[in-house]
Amino acid sequence: MKQFPEGFLWGGAVAANQYEGGWKEGGKGITVSDCARSHLDVDVQDYKKQNEVTTADIEEALNTQDEVYYPKRHGADGYHHYKEDIKLFAEMGFKVFRLSIAWARIFPNGDDAVPNEEGLKFYDDVFDECLKYGIEPLVTISHYEPPINLVLNYDGWYSREVIDMFVRYCEVIVDRYKDKVKYWLTFNEVDSMIRHPYTTGALIKDRFPGKNFNEVIFQAMHHQFVASALATKIVHEARPDAKVGCMLTKLTYYPYTCKPEDVLQAQQDMRSTYCYSDTQVFGEYPAYLLSKFKNEGINIKMEPDDLKIMKEYPVDFVSFSYYSSSCVAKDDNCLKKTAANTNVAIKNPYIPSSDWGWQIDPIGLRISLVDLYDRYRKPLFVVENGLGAKDELVNGTVDDQYRIDYFDAHFKEMYNAIVEDGVDLMGYTSWGCIDIVSESTKQMSKRYGFIYVDCDDLGNGTYKRYKKKSFDYYKHVIETNGACLFED
């Protein structure tokens, strides 16, 4: 009988900044995401404009209590609904639930002398609720949630001081939750700092006048690499059987034509995304990244033990997000473009697109799994994947057959990668297993979940939960460990 390996971890994923809400409750401080404004008047495919942030924007955000144009302040109101939501996840049969800890719930300003006990107790309750149903928490330590104080008073991860603050934060949460959490991720989509430095690195370009901003970004990235290695050390010392992973954005690139120039461009673009996971897996900077630093005059300041720390504490597994593939060409000026995950790419004429222009490519997931496993020879974990769509609630449910078709095709390609290609895949968590505020466009109407949340792009609604048609589909996939995918 065809089915996934025994012990395969099926589940779903959210991030605190998109799910929780409760932005000023329980002693929580303000985060970079609480100050990220939605731009409903900007083209949803214009990722750069959607995510540009200035110091003036932050000052404006801090002077308002508005939750309409700052939708991550309310999210899906998981802060008040998590027990109800976890019960629904258990009904689907989740083996694992990926979530993040909001740094500012534990240290409201990042540099506080003592942690916030109310925040620590909140996550105790969340993890206990998961474990009550036999659901393993998979915890992201930092998922676009640095306290805003780190931006305004330290210039974010550019400052070496932030490593020490992050390490103290890790020491507190790992000591507190080591008996409840076995699986950890250090930084979400660690490679994304080059594309959105504000949410990932707490960096704002106008705060570095006269500086090479790419150098600023890579300096901040170096600090995150050191911090990630130290976090891995902390977890392993606290719980030797725990597993720590890195997490990258899997941007799978195809050459638009077989012209050697296009093939080379695709290879170079792939390397530009792999350099971050290469560093965390192998514990050292790859030669091609060092060449980039030299050729572009980027000077990274390091402490004497930095490279030693990175080498001694690499990650145990590689996790990633996969939503779509992209086409690239050496000269793309005359080619039609479309949106993708945190970038814009050439439109592939052979595959369909979602409501938001992201191209749907299940085979690309298999290609990604094979590429990553051949490169790293470490267990893999798909921790984000799914279809953002415009769902319509009718008679208390959503007939989202389009989402079922999406998952069905992707799950079959995951199976092929495991059985035919020999990939060691630990598990799968669908992104936004319950509807949450979109990271890229700050919209609630871009829905990914098996569970519909009654809330619109302006925060209006009851926040009541409704099961979609895909809820029962995923429940059946999990209870049969994928065998139902191959039934006639």
Predicted feature locations:
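Active-site region of glycoside hydrolase catalytic domains
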Residues: 1-66, 91, 109-111, 120-488
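Active-site mouth loops of central-metabolism enzymes
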Residues: 67-81, 158-160
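Alpha-helical scaffolding within the catalytic cores
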Residues: 81-85, 304
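Short, well-structured secondary-structure segments
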Residues: 95-102, 136-140
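Glycine-rich, proline-tolerant flexible connector loops at the mouths of alpha/beta enzymes
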Residues: 101-115
